[in-house]
């Protein structure tokens, strides 16, 4: 029997060097496809976070900031572009590691690596553009003053990222933070840290100055919590669950520390009766089953017009049964395992609860018959939903789509907004004006028209309501990591003249 593919053995990345964790502990890496242990990651703790934050602070202040924080954006851009080039050079290796680590189909993981490189390139451009934005003048009503603005890095930032897009979600935070001149400590999810540690290797290879990016892997309570509460961290950016987001806000509050939160979702996709059914079916399934259904923005609540519901559901079942569920490294895989046994059991519980509450499982909901091991769940479509059901209200984070019918546009809007979340939404219709109306009516940070899930680093990303606040990516993405300073100068030769001058002796 062939031995399992193993992941590289790495340490923590602190101050430009590999360091063993202070307490010497390590966590197993489990391949969700085979359930086999394929390596280990270091289990960092508060001592390691302290060292990483100290390294980041030293890098920020080195040479009074001239080496990084106050260096021209063009200097930082060179490093970001070098990282992007190395990611592309190592794309096959990185994509395979991500497939092994979190179960993502290889083709998706390879696409993610292109996006990782593209994001570093984009924020390299933004770093250079920042040079041109410096000292921008402000028009004032008094000619005796002139004013300009400086945009300065906010400082040391703590970045806490999830396991569904391990390297890409980390890049969404690292690239703009470094472009802005910040230094950073990254704490990736303990369920998928492998490619983030390989990013550290890339940073070392391209000569990124020591301490600019530090990576501490480990459990949330042991490493993430000390990072978010650290008094020498100036900002925290987090992507993950609503419950963890609340804890991060609470830990930041005593220091009035800014946070950016991208949390959960239960996003709607609204399909009207004027669509090409097969095109709409494919986008509907892609919107929910992409990345094995583990997407914050998954459009996992399908609202389908009553007139076409029966035919649409039949075609969805046919398409879903045609999705290749397999080892992520198999050619043509379109659905791999969910990331861990814990997630697997949680998703199965959601499905069984829905069934016990009266919902109908149209297809899926079980392990594929041909896969004896691994955390696999067939693409699942559930109907006969009521709006009080758990499956309608709670984020499943797996390949589970729930379906509800509507008759009027107003009803569709009401159902679409019947959620505590507001990350994304989609509408599919041949009526452009109707699509425009719904894009305005749905309460979410991102709306897709006649598609679902496309995401580009050139456009802002973030949610409303319990999906968090702040926007990443886009031209404003770098501003998350900048502090604006106004510099106002009195330019008149005349004295100010507010106080009466004392008599000269």
Curated annotation (Swiss-Prot):
UniProt keyword annotation of Cell wall biogenesis/degradation present: no
GO BP annotations, alphabetical order: cellular detoxification of aldehyde; glycine betaine biosynthetic process from choline
Function summary: Dehydrogenase that catalyzes the oxidation of several aminoaldehydes. Metabolizes and detoxifies aldehyde products of polyamine degradation to non-toxic amino acids. Catalyzes the oxidation of 4-aminobutanal and 3-aminopropanal to 4-aminobutanoate and beta-alanine, respectively. Catalyzes the oxidation of 4-(trimethylamino)butanal and 4-guanidinobutanal to 4-trimethylammoniobutanoate and 4-guanidinobutanoate, respectively. Catalyzes the oxidation of betaine aldehyde to glycine betaine.
Organism: Zea mays
Binding site for NAD(+): 161-163, 187-190, 241-244, 262, 395, 461
Family recorded in the similarity comment: Belongs to the aldehyde dehydrogenase family.
Domain of life: Eukaryota
GO MF: 4-trimethylammoniobutyraldehyde dehydrogenase activity; aminobutyraldehyde dehydrogenase (NAD+) activity; betaine-aldehyde dehydrogenase (NAD+) activity; gamma-guanidinobutyraldehyde dehydrogenase (NAD+) activity; nucleotide binding; protein homodimerization activity; sodium ion binding
Recorded catalytic activity of this chain's protein: 4-aminobutanal + NAD(+) + H2O = 4-aminobutanoate + NADH + 2 H(+); 3-aminopropanal + NAD(+) + H2O = beta-alanine + NADH + 2 H(+); 4-(trimethylamino)butanal + NAD(+) + H2O = 4-(trimethylamino)butanoate + NADH + 2 H(+); 4-guanidinobutanal + NAD(+) + H2O = 4-guanidinobutanoate + NADH + 2 H(+)
Pathway the protein takes part in: Amine and polyamine biosynthesis; betaine biosynthesis via choline pathway; betaine from betaine aldehyde: step 1/1
Active-site residues from the entry: 262 (proton acceptor), 296 (nucleophile)
Keyword annotations of the record: Metal-binding, NAD, Nucleotide-binding, Oxidoreductase, Sodium
Subunit structure as annotated in this protein's UniProt entry: Forms homodimers.
InterPro entries the record matches: Ald_DH/histidinol_DH, Ald_DH_C, Ald_DH_CS_CYS, Ald_DH_CS_GLU, Ald_DH_N, Aldehyde_DH_dom
PANTHER family linked to this entry: BETAINE ALDEHYDE DEHYDROGENASE, BETAINE ALDEHYDE DEHYDROGENASE-RELATED
Residues reported to bind Na(+): 101, 191
EC number annotated for this UniProt entry: 1.2.1.-, 1.2.1.47, 1.2.1.19, 1.2.1.8
Protein name listed in UniProt: Aminoaldehyde dehydrogenase 1a
Entries under Pfam families matching the protein: Aldedh
Residues under site feature: Transition state stabilizer: 164
